[in-house]
């Protein structure tokens, strides 16, 4: 617990990080396709994407991360550049990317978990919840200095979680 507290104590208020999750789609059928490893490997040759690209549980999904921005505008600038590069990379490899919330017809049973220790552990521990997690979304992380302050902010947000969920489910 001490190490978690140290991380929060070293944080900077109101820094922002953005993560976008994209479905990897076959260009002809628009069905999910298991091409994460290929895209991730190709991204290693790009100095921006090498740091920005990450896996997110299933092989038909790819994520880009802005890194820590000093403010929202800074994070958006970084994310836009990485997104443009990732879309170009996907087009060069003959796949489409989409942020669809969930995929409308690709069966969750056909999705494969990325083969790493971490994701094998997630699949083992969460099973059905992990298997059904075929979602593609955007996350915004906001830095709050101090563990106690971060908990206090979460406590204050709890009464409006329903409204935040409604806004995010558009």
Where are these regions (language model features)?
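An acidic/histidine-cluster motif and surrounding catalytic segment
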Residues: 140
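Short strand->helix junction
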Residues: 69-72, 143, 147
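Loop-rich catalytic cores of soluble enzymes, especially ATP-dependent carboxylate-amine ligases
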Residues: 115, 144-170
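Terminal catalytic/cofactor-binding subdomain
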Residues: 1-129, 134-136
């Amino acid at each position: 617990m001490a190490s978690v507290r140290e991380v929060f104590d070293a944080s900077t208020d109101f820094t922002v990080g953005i993560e976008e999750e994209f479905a990897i789609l076959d260009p002809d059928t628009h069905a999910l396709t298991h091409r994460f490893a290929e895209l991730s490997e190709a991204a290693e040759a790009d100095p921006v994407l090498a740091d920005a690209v990450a896996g997110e549980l299933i092989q038909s999904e790819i994520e880009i991360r802005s890194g820590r921005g000093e403010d929202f505008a800074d994070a958006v600038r970084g994310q836009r550049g990485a997104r443009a590069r990732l879309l170009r990379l996907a087009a060069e490899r003959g796949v489409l990317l989409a942020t669809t919330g969930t995929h409308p017809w690709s069966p969750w049973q056909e999705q494969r978990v990325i083969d790493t220790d971490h994701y094998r552990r997630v699949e083992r521990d969460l099973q059905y919840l992990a298997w059904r997690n075929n979602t593609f979304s955007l996350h915004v992380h906001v830095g709050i200095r101090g563990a106690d302050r971060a908990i206090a902010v979460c406590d204050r947000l709890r009464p409006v979680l329903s409204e935040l969920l409604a806004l995010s489910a558009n």
